[in-house]
């Protein structure tokens, strides 16, 4: 029977990146894992197919070979058949199949397994990220079966597999090639459970919603990860559990924009404040602070408040707060206010206007020069 396309096996596009491949492989492996499907030959075959596909597509060189030549890239004769200048096909098969089934191509001992790592995304408000917070989270996971203490055996007894003799692998000879593959008798575990636990059906693990308390340190930012060692899935047959990785995502804030340990905000001021100068109050993480606005301040001027940013989670130094002034045009004017502004505008005439609005005058001169050059 011809092999299925590796991308089809994992259910991803041919343009899938490393993260998409990893997620697809995890879904596939969880669905067909022998520990979850004891005695199911079809599931075991699908599991091996998933691992083989991921082994090739997750390796840059093998993926390029596969994209160029398909499955033929790993068949006898491709690349010179192991002769000078070409890859040793026995090494290629040993690399692929050995890594897939937990051993080296030379038939080394079965590697110890552990539980899978779990990822969790925690969304925080800026205030929580800056000050730190303790959160209770609930995650679905595979926990050690309490009835058999994770052994999978009702009476706690296991027997050494009489096919692989405890190695979990068998050596298959196909022509001139020797390959390692998981033992069909024990599913790669190296042991046989005579009396499977009725609760976990010999798996040693049960599905469970675990509740944990996670302490988030002050100063974290989007993309930071917190590792909780041993809080991942329980390992099969009493092997060590995996880890839990909590990834932080900080929500957008109504006032502040964060850039590392610095904060940025906009401070609206009136035309009169910008022209005459004033003192305005601004919000900071620690309360209010004052900024002195000098006379003739223009939109876009930055004011720096040292140490009013975020305390770094790594160095414990503090960032700064940058306040950008925005001169706000007044709206909803009363008749008296409109008349005053009209009187004020009437004072700008001729060369006198250039003195009071230098940027506007420079812009007008630039436009005039442009049209003079265009029409000359």
Curated annotation (Swiss-Prot):
Q: What is known of its domains?
A: The J domain is necessary and sufficient to stimulate DnaK ATPase activity. Zinc center 1 plays an important role in the autonomous, DnaK-independent chaperone activity of DnaJ. Zinc center 2 is essential for interaction with DnaK and for DnaJ activity.
Protein name (record): Chaperone protein DnaJ
The gene name on file is dnaJ
Query: What is its quaternary makeup?
Result: Homodimer.
**Where does it live in the cell?**
Cytoplasm
This protein's record includes keyword Electron transport = no
Extract the GO molecular function terms from the UniProt entry. Answer: ATP binding; heat shock protein binding; unfolded protein binding; zinc ion binding
Q: Where are the zinc fingers (CR-type)?
A: 132-209
Q: Name one GO biological process term.
A: response to heat
Q: Known InterPro entries for this protein?
A: DnaJ (IPR012724), DnaJ_C (IPR002939), DnaJ_domain (IPR001623), HSP40/DnaJ_pept-bd (IPR008971), HSP_DnaJ_Cys-rich_dom (IPR001305), HSP_DnaJ_Cys-rich_dom_sf (IPR036410), J_dom_sf (IPR036869)
The record's free-text note on cofactor binding: Binds 2 Zn(2+) ions per monomer.
Q: Where does Zn(2+) 2 bind?
A: 161, 164, 183, 186
What family is this protein classified in?
Answer: Belongs to the DnaJ family.
Q: What does this protein do?
A: Participates actively in the response to hyperosmotic and heat shock by preventing the aggregation of stress-denatured proteins and by disaggregating proteins, also in an autonomous, DnaK-independent fashion. Unfolded proteins bind initially to DnaJ; upon interaction with the DnaJ-bound protein, DnaK hydrolyzes its bound ATP, resulting in the formation of a stable complex. GrpE releases ADP from DnaK; ATP binding to DnaK triggers the release of the substrate protein, thus completing the reaction cycle.
Q: Name its co-factor(s).
A: Zn(2+)
Q: Give the UniProt entry's GO cellular component terms.
A: cytoplasm
Query: Where do the CXXCXGXG motif repeat units fall?
Result: 145-152, 161-168, 183-190, 197-204
Q: J domain: which residues? A: 5-70
**Protein's UniProt keywords contain Transcription:** no
Keyword annotations for this protein, in alphabetical order, are: Chaperone, Cytoplasm, DNA replication, Metal-binding, Repeat, Stress response, Zinc, Zinc-finger
Which residues does Zn(2+) 1 bind?
145, 148, 197, 200
Tell me the segments the record calls region Disordered: 223-242
């Amino acid at each position: 029977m011809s092999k299925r396309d590796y991308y089809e096996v994992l259910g991803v596009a041919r343009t899938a990146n490393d993260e998409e491949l990893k997620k697809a492989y995890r879904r596939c492996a969880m669905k067909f894992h022998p520990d979850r499907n004891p005695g199911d030959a079809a599931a075991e075959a699908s599991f091996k197919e998933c691992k083989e596909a991921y082994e090739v597509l997750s390796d840059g060189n093998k993926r390029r070979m596969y994209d160029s030549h398909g499955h033929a890239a790993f068949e006898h004769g491709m690349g010179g058949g192991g002769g000078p200048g070409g890859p040793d096909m026995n090494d290629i098969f040993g690399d692929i199949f050995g890594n897939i089934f937990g051993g080296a191509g030379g038939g080394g001992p079965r590697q110890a397994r552990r539980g899978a790592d779990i990822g969790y995304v925690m969304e925080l408000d800026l205030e929580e990220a800056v000050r730190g917070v303790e959160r209770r989270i609930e995650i679905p996971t595979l926990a050690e079966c309490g009835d058999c203490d994770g052994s999978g055996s009702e009476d706690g007894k296991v027997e050494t597999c009489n096919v692989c003799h405890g190695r979990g692998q068998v050596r298959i000879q196909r022509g001139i090639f020797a390959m390692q593959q998981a033992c069909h008798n024990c599913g790669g575990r190296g042991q046989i459970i005579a009396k499977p636990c009725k609760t976990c059906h010999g798996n040693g693990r049960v599905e469970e919603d675990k509740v944990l308390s996670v302490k988030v340190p002050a100063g974290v930012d989007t993309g930071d990860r917190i590792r909780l060692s041993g809080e991942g899935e329980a390992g099969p047959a009493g092997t060590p559990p995996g880890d839990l990785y909590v990834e932080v995502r900080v929500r957008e804030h109504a006032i502040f924009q964060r850039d590392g340990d610095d904060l940025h905000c906009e401070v609206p001021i009136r035309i009169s404040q910008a022209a005459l100068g004033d003192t305005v109050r601004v919000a900071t993480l620690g309360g209010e602070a004052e900024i002195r606005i000098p006379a003739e301040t223009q939109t876009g001027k930055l004011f720096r408040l040292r140490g009013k940013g975020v305390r770094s989670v790594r160095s414990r130094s503090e960032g700064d707060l940058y306040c950008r002034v925005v001169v706000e045009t007044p709206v909803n004017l009363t008749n008296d206010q409109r008349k005053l502004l009209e009187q004020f505008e009437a004072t700008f005439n001729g060369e006198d206007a250039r003195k009071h609005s230098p940027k506007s005058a420079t812009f007008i001169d630039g436009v005039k020069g442009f049209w003079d050059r265009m029409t000359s």
